[in-house]
Each structure stands twice: as C-alpha cells, then as structure tokens.
C-alpha cells in the first residue's frame, strides 16, 4: 500500500506549488479539492461557483461535499500501485476550517479523521514573503496565520505528529519533503 503524506497549511503557504513540483518529479499527487471544484464550475459556466466559499448557502452541505471528495481521494489511493501518494490537504483540513468558521459538526465529520489515517503530515507555515490574496484566496495574512494554528491543532488532536517544512525555494522544500519521508522509512 502507498505511503500517504498530507501537505497542509494555511492559505498562500506554497502547498499547490510544492505538490505540483512533486508531481512533475513523478510522484502521485491528489490536488486541492476546492480548486478542482472551481475549475469544473468554470468549465460548466456556473459563475456562482467561481469562488465557492463566497456563495455557499448551506455551509454544512458544502463541507460534507468536501469531506466526501477527500474521502474519495483517500480510498482511490488504496487502488494505486505506487510507493507513495501526496495529498494537497487531508480529511482533517475540513474540520479545521469548520473550526475556523465556528461551524458545528458531529461524528459524520469526525469519524473519517479518526479512521482514515495518513502516514505523514507535513505543515507549511505562514510565509509573508510569498503570501498573495487573489480570487481564490480571500484571507488576510493574519487570517492565514490563524488558520495555520487551527490546522496544526486539529491534526495533533487526531494523534498526528505534524512536521513543519521550512520556508525556502521550491527545490529546497521538495528536497526537505523527500528527505523527511526517506528518514521515516
């Protein structure tokens, strides 16, 4: 079975660039669900979904959809014949964001975080030098820092050792990720 590694962190920390570079180097990667949802909606001409977070009428249903999509990624990886898999965000990210937005949830949301386990959780810290707001990233840098703290707390709450990836060039970060995983084997 593939070793499952989550790359997480607040908005604008370089997760997508890191996952994309790992993929270019031949590693199997699952990309951020919200980005996929946004791209699909744009393809279908659904302007209300260009920024899904801004148009959510039922936050619980939206988060349920995100959770199910992340569970599907997790389950899909079980079928792969590869040694490792990287995820741009994991199942507990859904809970962390619900905590950030002060949304309640029940065991429907907590059970997957307890039962579907990743082998490693790598956290990219806030990095003001690369942080930019855009059409998909609406949070301020201070909000990104708060989300980072909630993400770290949430993963630790579910028993994960969270390993921070230092700021650096994309090449340095890729090498650090691969070194950490090689040491864990």
Which stretches of residues belong to each language-model region?
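C-terminal alpha-helix
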Residues: 176-184
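Conserved glycine(s) of the Walker
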Residues: 14
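The Walker A (P-loop) glycine that initiates the GxxxxGKT/S ATP-binding motif of P-loop NTPases
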Residues: 9
């Amino acid at each position: 079975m593939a070793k499952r590694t989550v790359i997480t962190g607040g908005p604008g920390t370089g997760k997508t660039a890191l996952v994309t570079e790992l993929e270019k180097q031949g590693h199997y990667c699952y990309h951020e669900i919200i980005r996929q949802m946004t791209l699909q909606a744009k393809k279908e001409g659904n302007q209300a979904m260009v920024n899904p977070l801004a148009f959510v009428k039922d936050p619980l249903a939206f988060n349920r959809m995100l959770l199910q999509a992340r569970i599907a990624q997790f389950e899909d990886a079980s079928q792969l014949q590869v040694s490792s898999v990287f995820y741009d965000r994991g199942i507990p990210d859904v809970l962390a964001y619900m905590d950030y937005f002060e949304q309640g949830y029940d065991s429907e949301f907590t059970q997957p975080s307890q039962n579907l386990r990743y082998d490693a959780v790598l956290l990219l810290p806030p990095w003001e030098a690369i942080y930019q707001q855009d059409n998909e990233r609406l949070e301020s840098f201070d909000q990104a820092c708060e989300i980072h703290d909630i993400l770290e707390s949430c993963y630790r709450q579910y028993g994960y050792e969270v390993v921070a990836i230092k700021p650096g060039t994309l090449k340095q970060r890729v090498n650090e990720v691969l070194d950490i995983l090689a040491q864990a084997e």
